[in-house]
Amino acid sequence: FIFDEGHQLAGKCLDQFTLLSRSPSTRQALRETAQWLIAQHDSLSEFVGQEGLLEELRGVLTDLTQLNDDVAAWGESYLEQHAEQSDEYRFPQGIIPDALREHSGALVNVWRRQLDLAQRLEVALDNRREEAEIQLRDTVDAWLGSVQAMVARAEGQLELWHSYKSAELPDLDEPWARWLKAASRNGEGVVFMASPVLARDLLHEHLWSRAAGVVMTSATLSALGSFDRLRSMTGLPVDALYKRVESPFDAQQGVFAIPDLQSDPGDSEAHTAEIIARLPDLINGDAGVLMLFSSRRQMEAVVTGVSGTLDHEILVQDSLSKSRLLERHRENIDEGRRSLIMGLASFAEGIDLPGDYCDHVVIAKLPFSVPDNPREAAHAELLEALGRNAFMEISVPDAALRLVQASGRLLRTEEDRGRITLMDRRLLTRRYGRAILESLPRYRFDLPAAG
């Protein structure tokens, strides 16, 4: 196997094993399944001769609909009481309240019954399929498809609710994050979610122990000059080999600058105001500019604050599709107009803007993780419970990696030159700053004098 962008492997693995139950869509699926059973009842009963099974299945669907409504109502109430300003709530240490575990236990029992009935119906249909007349085969296949969807849905629901039912005590060996979030902006409906916190055991079971050979490549596999973070996230075998290859591009053709700032990102209002005040002079004369933010709120505030003060057309992430936005940016440069892209984390990797398309990358602040990401918060909580420093073990290495990714948008060919400006003095004032600075490519540095 060869995995490009290998730094994403652990996250993609955890995404794959994340469980969820979205109460509105579950209710809709149950309702549609019940209607399908009613519509197909006579034909199905005549074909498979399972009258009692079909009636029992209809009853189970009714019970599941009620249980789904009950747990959704509980979740809506709990979010309203505990989520404060957010539409999301993570259960500390993954431990589920007693009332929700009771709901979960009831759901496990009835979903298991639905799974058993659906599997029996699937077997009955499959056994009779070969005996069916040719003109009935398409109908039987359609029935099988519907029943197999019921089986798959029940299996997914069972995994989620079993995870909740069993979450009475913290598990430091195989930790899980569990959380709720609103299913819609109006607060109606709840999404119940659960995810493993660590990918290493999953990757060992499903990849490292099975593959004869694996190659992982990425411009950002190492963080802070080592592969420790990668090993921690992925559980790579002890005999894995590591190699850092220098970029073919000359980092000396780029300048990495930190202005002499008066504000700190810890004071978001003052920091945003200083960015707005400095940006016109900062990018004056630059043709193509890419500005990257860690916060959508700050990005939107800066867009509003600099409107009408720049010579550049401002292209904001999500105002157009990503491909169209990049196309518009290139058109601006090709036609002699200045252009400024403002984007979030997804614009910090995988974007190629060589030459004049990007001669200045502006980074609003050090790209630390969003602290309310449930899985990352659960990981930090786990490390703290083990007496370790989550900030230094997770946040700083990840920020260093993301800063390298963001800075890497500047030099895309051997001829490229330009400037990277980080609007964050913490790289110079905090104890972790030197380690992050030393992990950057060998740019020419333009830093304010100490003191």
Task: Please provide the spans of the model-predicted regions.
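ASCE RecA-like P-loop NTPase motor cores
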Residues: 1-451
